[in-house]
Curated annotation (Swiss-Prot):
One GO term of the biological process aspect: DNA-templated viral transcription
Gene: OPG093
Swiss-Prot/TrEMBL induction comment: Expressed in the intermediate phase of the viral replicative cycle.
The UniProt record lists the keyword Transcription regulation: yes
MF term (GO), any: identical protein binding
InterPro entries: Pox_TAP
Protein name per its UniProtKB record: Late transcription factor 1
Length: 260
């Protein structure tokens, strides 16, 4: 079982995720024809991308597979492949490896006769495959009780001014979401109108770590605005905030849990 992927698509993925983590977990769902890429950033922050299987990302297998990919190592070695390469990614779960391979054929004029010259490249990278696991992505898309749009640069500017605090209070009033620093002295408050806000949600208040919001800084060059949802599970437990956007050719999600 392996994934065949165009090098341009692989470059996008590793360039993006290597800014946040040295490795990611890849989950291929052959039934839904989707590939999920997941990384845990710490502090109850999870990031994942959803990529449809297609001509540029093709899965050679019938069963679902989960494995780890060392994106930082992959990013460093992609210069070994031709710019038009299609790369096979094959995990070796038993030996804690992942293999990248590709070939390229060019025609060379040899005594006025075109001769095909084939170049094969194979790179084996070590990575602990025992830690890979299936992440329940659907849990965070089951229910939404609030929705707004947040301009990333403005949010980052706001939290830069309140770096002396550890968390923000999250409240809901008159179909608005309010982010506020603790206390009434030297207090900062940011308010967003919401396109969707359940009446039940406006009875609650939460806390979110500023260190979690700071992890959005890595998106600054790629994202202008995030669709932001307050998500719940099937038992109506409010889980946290889900930031979503489409980056280049794939959808990206960042989930931040509310603090207890």
């Amino acid at each position: 079982m392996s994934i065949r992927i165009k090098i341009d698509k692989l470059r996008q993925i590793v360039a993006y995720f290597s800014e946040f983590s040295e490795e990611v977990s890849i989950n291929v769902d052959s039934t839904d024809e989707l590939m999920y890429i997941f990384a845990a950033l710490g502090g109850s922050v999870n990031i994942w991308a959803i990529i449809p299987l297609s001509a540029s990302v093709f899965y050679r297998g019938a069963e679902n597979i989960v494995f780890n990919l060392p994106v930082s190592k992959v990013k460093s070695c992609l210069c070994s492949f031709h710019n038009d390469a299609i790369i096979d990614i094959e995990p070796d779960l038993e030996n804690n490896l992942v293999k990248l391979s590709s070939y390229h054929v060019v025609s060379v004029d040899c005594n006025k006769e075109l001769m095909p010259i084939r170049t094969d490249t194979t790179i084996c990278l070590s990575i602990d495959q025992k830690k890979s696991y299936v992440f329940n992505f659907h849990k965070y898309e089951e229910k939404c009780c609030g929705r707004t749009v947040i301009h990333l640069e403005w949010l980052l500017g706001f939290i830069k001014c309140i770096s002396q605090h550890q968390h923000l209070a999250i409240m809901f009033k008159d179909d608005n979401i309010i982010m506020k620093t603790p206390g009434n002295t030297d207090a900062f408050s940011r308010e967003y109108s919401m396109t969707e806000c359940s009446q039940e949600l406006q009875k609650f208040s939460f806390k979110i770590a500023i260190s979690s919001l700071n992890k959005l800084r890595g998106f600054k060059k790629r994202v202008n605005v995030f669709e932001t949802r307050i998500v719940m599970d099937n038992d109506d437990n409010i889980l946290g905030m889900l930031f979503s956007d489409r980056v280049q050719s794939f959808k990206i999600n960042i989930f931040m849990a509310f603090l207890d």
